[in-house]
Amino acid sequence: MAEAVVTVDGWSALHDTRQFDWTSWKLISKEERQAAIDEFQQLISKWEAVEEEKQGSHGIYKVVGNKADFMFIFLRESFQELEQIKTEINKTKLGDFLIPGYSYVSIIEKTMHDPMKAGEDRELSAYVKEALKPTMPKWEHACFYPMARRRDPGVNWFEIEKEERTKLLYEHGMTGRKYAGKVKEIITGSIGLDEWEWGVTLFAHDPLQFKKIVYEMRFDEVTTKYAEFGDFIVGNFLEKEELSNHLSI
């Protein structure tokens, strides 16, 4: 029987997408709109203080395409905190116009064996600890997608021996290293938590790099034989100070 992977786990993650009710937004007064924006900016300031204390991280993105208008990404110590954030958003005046859409719940994880070091067990170095509880880069673009490993007869990731999985992931990691400085990623595990098995969040200064890295990785055996993907959501980073201009009528 194949050996299960042991993971070390970090912060909990929530990807929360919202449609914006522009029709209703246009019906309220300019003063009401500004009051709603001011209140929400105060909430963002609260999140910034949490990030400053390294107790969590967040990012807000204007979604490209019609899957959503906004994507909020939150990293926190617990699911209780993630649920509290969702509720805080809904209680604000702006929350009346932020219609809940797709969401994804997961936990940052690293496998205890490092495929980039011949499968040796990881040491919980400062680097690994930082990766488990990261500050999300405030780069211009983010891309999120869920994925799973195939469990088909004869092509079942969970039947492969640990050594073979390590080799395939090493090759996959070498492809990723080509994009160092161009793309950063956060991998979250979601088995038992959401519809897919993992979530992948990529950050880049140039969205073209999302296309390039995902395309090149499609040729890795770990992807060609064993990977399945959900929908991709791409967004542009929204600064707190931009909110008023973005929602102006």
From Swiss-Prot:
InterPro entries: CHDC, ChdC/CLD, Dimeric_a/b-barrel. The keyword Metal-binding applies. It comes from the Bacteria. Coiled coil: none annotated. It is an enzyme of class 1 (oxidoreductase). One of its GO terms (biological process) is heme B biosynthetic process. It holds the Pfam family Chlor_dismutase. Fe-coproporphyrin III acts both as a substrate and a redox cofactor. Its cofactor is Fe-coproporphyrin III. Pathway: Porphyrin-containing compound metabolism; protoheme biosynthesis. Involved in coproporphyrin-dependent heme b biosynthesis. Catalyzes the decarboxylation of Fe-coproporphyrin III (coproheme) to heme b (protoheme IX), the last step of the pathway. The reaction occurs in a stepwise manner with a three-propionate intermediate. Belongs to the ChdC family. Type 1 subfamily. This is Coproheme decarboxylase. It comes from Oceanobacillus iheyensis (strain DSM 14371 / CIP 107618 / JCM 11309 / KCTC 3954 / HTE831). The gene is chdC.
